[in-house]
Amino acid sequence: MRFAPYLISAVVITTIILGGAWWTSAMDTKLQTKMKEIIDQHTSTWTPVVSSVTSTQTDTLRVTISEVVSVTATLTETFTATPTVTSVVHALATTDPHPDNSKIVILMGSNFQNDANSPLHPFAQSIIKNRREYAERHGYKFEFLDADAYASRVTGHLMPWVKVPMLQDTMKKYPDAEWIWWLDHDALVMNKDLNVVDHVLKHDRLNTILTREAEYKSGAGIPADGFRTPKDQDAKDVHFIISQDFNGINAGSLFIRNSEVGRWIVDLWFEPLYLDHIQGYAEQQAFSHMVFYHPQVYKHVGVVPLKAINAYDFDDNIWGYDDGDLCIHFAGCNYFKNCPEKFLKYAQILSSKQGSDWMSAQEKDHIQNLLKPSS
């Protein structure tokens, strides 16, 4: 009987593992069912598949179809699947190879302007002004949404989720917009002369910066190494632009095309099953899950270098900010409790180029006092 405790422990661990696998598989089955419902709501985006596809399921959760790379697991089951839909390029009328500036919307959402305990509260109006004036300079539209007004839509969930219904509402509010650029509140536009159409969005430019066949960083939402971005992706097929860091996909800065494909992706992203079951990295983890498990999402997501749209305050030539980069994102500053320090570092850089005009009138004196060298 001396082995009884070990046997009991082994049984308990095995039960937990099998139970977790069952729960995860059941969740993914529900997500697949819900995804089909959402697809059916956007019927003009999809066309029927006429032939069956024989595929090997090498992961208990993921059906490997088309160009998606399969991964090897212990148990392998071969089956024949006839998908009901496959994605096609959206109408050319909404995939302009060189969108007009007037059809770009910069979206920002936060409650830091209301919350005196927010570490960036003393600088909130200047950050908003920085974003708005950049939009006005290039003829983009600017939309700021109060996160407190969206709290009821993510009750019981982490606040970063509010960006998804904000995207949904903005896409509806600006039906003629071509692209929505979401940039987190803990960021500053650093190069006011850089036009995001020329820098990222026009097809010939996007085709030069897409990271094709690059490995997605494994982690939250992407459980396996060796999963890569599409090999032959073309800008005309991209409806979602994002970047990744050492933790994987980072949703602090992203571009979403206001097309049926784009709206479908956002609708799936806000599926209640994701909100209820995904914690940790919240909306980032959910989006990673979508990319990894759903080929229809995978093929329309373009990954670009972090520095192109989402530079960090790192001493690193891959992720770190360099003079001339579009923006700086203080990623993780809440966790490291250094948001004010990050802001002031880049406020100093902006002031050396633009003086104090970028600051809000009510915050200018406070910021300038903080920027004075200590005696």
UniProtKB/Swiss-Prot annotation:
It is a single-pass type II membrane protein. Its main location: Golgi. Residues 1-2 are cytoplasmic. Pfam families: Glyco_transf_34. Residues 24-375 are lumenal. Coiled coil: none annotated. It comes from the Eukaryota. Its EC number is 2.4.1.-. It is an enzyme of class 2 (transferase). Keywords: Glycoprotein, Glycosyltransferase, Golgi apparatus, Membrane, Signal-anchor, Transferase, Transmembrane, Transmembrane helix. One of its GO terms (molecular function) is alpha-1,2-galactosyltransferase activity. O-glycosylated. It is found in: Golgi apparatus membrane. GO terms for cellular component: Golgi apparatus; Golgi membrane; mannan polymerase II complex. The chain crosses the membrane at residues 3-23. The keyword Transferase applies. GO terms for biological process: protein N-linked glycosylation; protein N-linked glycosylation via asparagine; protein O-linked glycosylation. The keyword Glycosyltransferase applies. Belongs to the glycosyltransferase 34 family. PANTHER family: ALPHA-1,2-GALACTOSYLTRANSFERASE (PTHR31306:SF4), ALPHA-1,6-MANNOSYLTRANSFERASE MNN11-RELATED (PTHR31306). Involved in the O- and N-linked oligosaccharide modification of proteins transported through the Golgi stack. This occurs in cis Golgi where the enzyme transfers galactose from UDP-galactose to a variety of mannose based acceptors. This is Alpha-1,2-galactosyltransferase. The lineage of its organism: Eukaryota, Fungi, Dikarya, Ascomycota, Taphrinomycotina.
